A protein has these predicted regions:
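Electrostatic cytochrome c docking/interface patches
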Residues: 52-83, 122-124, 131, 146-170, ...
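The canonical Cys-X-X-Cys-His
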Residues: 84-95, 135, 172-184
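Gly/Gly-Pro-rich "capping" loops immediately C-terminal to redox-active cysteine motifs
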Residues: 92-122, 181-207, 309
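C-terminal capping alpha-helices of c-type cytochrome domains
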Residues: 124-154, 208, 213-252, 256
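Central antiparallel beta-sheet cores of small beta-barrel/beta-sandwich binding domains
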Residues: 180, 255, 259-346, 351-358
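Edge beta-strand at a domain terminus
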Residues: 247, 255, 336-379, 584-594
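Beta-strand/beta-sandwich contexts
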Residues: 369-408, 425, 453-503, 600-604
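Immunoglobulin-like IPT/TIG beta-sandwich domains and homologous Ig-like subdomains
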Residues: 388-451, 510-513, 520, 530-534, ...
Length: 605
C-alpha cells in the first residue's frame, strides 16, 4: 500500500464517520457538539475523498453504499437481533445480511470484548452490560477461532508475560511488537481489506506511529522512494497468514457445540512461589444456557498443606474456550481470579491458567482430567528423587485410588523401589521409596491400578546448576495513584545430562528448589543506587515494588524505578558433603505504571 493508498483509506473512513455524524445531528445538545466537530472535519476531507474514489451509482435514500472491497472473500451473515439493533446504525447491513467491518473478521472472546469496549469509550455507543455480553457471546461463537488457530496464541488470553518469538516473518514482528505482543495479532483473522483498515485505525488513533513504531530505525533512506512501507509488508503477510476463511474454521464450525463437561474433574497444577497443588473441580451446567456453568474447586498445596476452596462461574465460548471467574471462600468479592482454559476435543481434559492482579501477574498453571469410575493420577510430590536416597517419602495424589494396594503395585520404573505404603485413601497415597545409587537419571512414568502419569518423577544424582525464572522480569511501581505490578521469581534446578555440559538439549529439569533470595545493583548509571529504592524481595521470591511518584529521598527527586539483579543462592545437600553453593541471577526492570490502558483493571469478563 502506498502512502496515498493509506491516506485514501483513512479519508474513506472519515467520510463514512461524517455521514454518520450528519445523520446523528438532532435536537440533543450533547450529540450536536460532537457531530458538528465531525461535520467540520468532513468539509476538509470529503472533497479529497471524492477525488480519490471513483464515482458510484445512485444510492437509495437512507442507505450508504458499501465501499468496494478488493478482497472478495465472502463475509459472515449476521442474523443476531441484538447485534443488528445495536450495531447496524454504523455498520450497515446489506441485503444478504453482511455488516460492514463486522462480517469480515474473527476473534477470540477477548478480542471482541476489546472492540465493544472501544466502541463504548471512543464512539459513545450506549450499550447496557447485558447487551454487551450477548453481543460478545454471539461473535465469539459465530466468528471465533478454531482450536488449532487459537492455541498458538493462547498465551495472550492467558495473560502470560513471556518472551515469545514470532518466526513466520521477522519484519512483521518488528513492526508490531513495539506496542503489543504478536499474540494479539495471531488471535485474529481478517480479510485483506480488514487488515488494511486496521492499519488506518492505528494511524487514526496514533498519528505519530509511522515514525515512533512502524519505522523504529528512523526515516527511510533517500533512495528508497519505491520501497514498501513496513506496514504494507506486514499487511501482505498478515492477509496471507491469518485470512478470514480457513479449513480449520470450516471444519470446527461444522461440528462445534456446547461441551458437556458437567461433573467431577481431577485438578492439578503449580503456583510460582507456593508450589504444586491438587484437588477436585465440580462443574454444574446452568439451567438457562448449555454453555454456562457454575464451579466449585477444592485443592491442597503440597508444601504446607493449605486447603483452598473456590466458587465461581464460567462460559465456554466456541465450544472449547473456557472463560471463568472464581472467588476464594471468605475472600473479598473484588479478589476474584480469572480463569482461561482450553477444553480438549473429547471433553476429557482441560488446561490453562488462573490469574489475578492489577496486571494479571499472579497466576497458576492448571490441568484437569475428567473423573470416571477408574483411578486417576494427578501429581507426585516431591518429583525430584535423588539417586542413592533411602526412606524418601512421596505423596501420590489423584482420585479413586485403591485403599488396599501392595508396594510392588506402585511402579515408578527402573531403579526406584517402593518399600512401604505409609497411608492410602481414595485421593492420596503416601509411600516410602528407595532409589538405586546407579539408577539412570531422567524422568519416570508412574503406573498404578491401570492408571498412568507421564513424567511423574525425576531421578537425578546431583544438581549441576540453577536458573532463575523469568530470566528477565518486570515490575511497576504503584500503590499511590496506580496499582503495583509485582514479579514472582522461581529457582529451577538442572542436571547437565549425559554430555555433562550446561545449556544443551539433553539437560534435565529437576524442578523448583528452595533458595535464599536477594537483590544486587545492576550497573547502568553510576551511583544511582537503584537497589535502595526500587523495592524488596521476600524469601518466597516475590518482588514488591515501591510507591509510584517522585521520591524526595532520591537524588533528583526521581521516581523509584531502576534496574537490579535478582540473585538466588542454593545450598546443595548431596550425601551431606557440604557442596559449594550454587548461584543464579535474573534481570529485573522496575518501571513506571501503565498510565493508559484500553482495558479497565477490574470488570466482568
Amino acid at each position: 500500500m502506498t502512502a496515498f493508498g493509506a491516506i485514501r483509506i483513512t479519508l474513506d473512513l472519515l467520510a463514512a464517520r461524517c455521514d454518520e455524524a450528519k445523520e446523528a445531528v438532532d435536537d440533543k445538545a450533547e450529540v450536536m457538539s460532537r457531530s458538528l466537530s465531525l461535520v467540520l472535519l468532513c468539509a476538509l476531507t470529503t472533497g479529497a475523498s471524492a477525488q480519490a474514489t471513483p464515482a458510484a451509482g445512485p444510492v437509495p435514500p437512507g442507505q450508504r453504499a458499501e465501499p468496494a472491497r478488493k478482497d472478495t472473500t465472502p463475509g459472515f451473515v449476521i442474523r443476531d437481533q441484538a447485534v443488528i439493533a445495536n450495531c447496524a446504525g454504523c455498520h450497515v447491513r446489506d441485503s444478504a445480511g453482511h455488516m460492514e467491518r463486522l462480517s469480515y473478521m474473527r476473534k477470540t472472546p477477548e478480542g471482541w470484548e476489546s472492540s465493544i469496549r472501544r466502541m463504548v469509550v471512543l464512539q459513545d455507543v450506549r450499550l447496557d452490560p447485558a447487551a454487551a455480553r450477548a453481543i460478545n457471546k454471539y461473535f465469539s461463537n459465530h466468528q471465533g477461532l478454531a482450536p488449532a488457530e487459537a492455541k498458538p496464541a493462547r498465551f495472550e488470553a492467558e495473560r502470560r508475560m513471556i518472551d515469545h518469538q514470532y518466526t513466520a516473518d521477522a519484519r512483521t514482528e518488528r513492526t508490531c511488537r513495539a506496542c503489543h505482543s504478536l499474540g494479539r495479532v495471531m488471535s485474529q483473522r481478517r480479510t485483506r481489506d480488514e487488515w488494511e483498515l486496521l492499519l488506518a485505525t492505528h494511524r487514526a488513533y496514533y498519528p505519530l506511529v509511522d515514525f515512533q513504531a512502524f519505522r523504529r530505525g528512523g526515516p527511510p533512506p533517500p533512495d528508497s522512494a519505491g520501497a514498501p512501507h513496513p506496514m504494507d509488508i506486514a499487511v501482505t503477510h498478515l492477509a496471507r497468514a491469518f485470512p478470514l476463511r480457513t479449513p480449520d474454521w470450516a471444519a470446527w464450525s461444522a461440528t462445534m457445540r456446547p461441551p458437556r463437561i458437567e461433573g467431577e474433574w481431577v485438578l492439578a497444577g503449580s503456583e510460582p512461589g507456593r508450589g504444586p497443588f491438587s484437588g477436585r473441580l465440580t462443574v454444574t451446567r446452568s439451567a438457562t444456557a448449555d454453555d454456562e456453568f457454575t464451579t466449585r474447586a477444592t485443592y491442597q498445596y503440597a508444601r504446607g498443606g493449605t486447603v483452598v476452596t473456590r466458587e465461581g462461574r464460567a462460559i465456554v465460548y466456541t465450544g472449547f474456550q473456557w472463560r471463568g471467574r472464581s472467588n476464594e471462600s471468605g475472600a473479598p468479592a473484588d479478589s476474584a481470579w480469572r480463569e482461561v482454559m482450553f477444553v480438549e476435543p473429547g471433553w476429557q481434559e482441560m488446561s490453562g491458567r488462573w490469574f489475578k492482579g492489577g496486571y494479571d501477574e499472579f497466576g497458576m498453571d492448571v490441568s484437569l482430567r475428567r473423573l470416571s469410575a477408574g483411578p486417576v493420577l494427578a501429581s507426585v510430590y516431591p518429583r525430584a528423587l535423588r539417586a542413592g536416597a533411602r526412606n524418601q517419602q512421596v505423596t501420590v495424589t489423584g482420585a479413586n485410588l485403591p485403599r488396599e494396594t501392595q508396594a510392588q503395585a506402585v511402579d515408578f520404573g527402573p531403579g526406584v523401589r517402593v518399600e512401604q505404603i505409609v497411608r492410602a485413601d481414595p485421593d492420596s497415597l503416601v509411600v516410602r521409596v528407595a532409589v538405586d545409587s546407579a539408577a539412570s537419571v531422567g524422568a519416570r512414568d508412574l503406573f498404578l491400578a491401570g492408571a498412568a502419569l507421564r513424567g511423574a518423577a525425576i531421578v537425578y544424582d546431583k544438581v549441576a546448576r540453577i536458573k532463575v525464572t523469568p530470566l528477565a522480569g518486570m515490575a511497576r511501581v504503584g500503590g499511590a495513584a496506580y496499582p503495583k505490578q509485582y514479579q514472582q521469581f522461581e529457582a529451577i534446578a538442572y542436571h547437565n545430562g549425559a554430555d555433562a555440559k550446561p545449556d544443551t538439549e539433553d539437560d534435565i529439569e529437576i524442578g523448583p528448589v528452595d533458595v535464599a533470595w536477594g537483590l544486587e545493583e545492576y550497573g547502568v548509571t553510576f551511583d544511582d543506587d537503584d537497589v535502595k529504592f526500587v523495592g524488596r524481595i521476600d524469601q518466597r521470591g516475590l518482588f514488591t515494588p515501591n510507591l509510584d511518584g517522585p521520591n524526595r529521598q532520591r537524588s533528583g527527586n526521581r521516581n523509584n524505578i531502576g534496574d537490579v539483579w535478582v540473585v538466588a543462592t542454593y545450598q546443595p545437600d548431596e550425601n551431606g558433603n557440604g557442596a559449594r553453593p550454587l548461584k543464579a541471577r535474573a534481570h529485573l526492570l522496575v518501571t513506571v505504571p501503565l498510565y493508559l490502558r484500553w482495558e479497565p483493571w477490574k470488570g466482568e469478563p
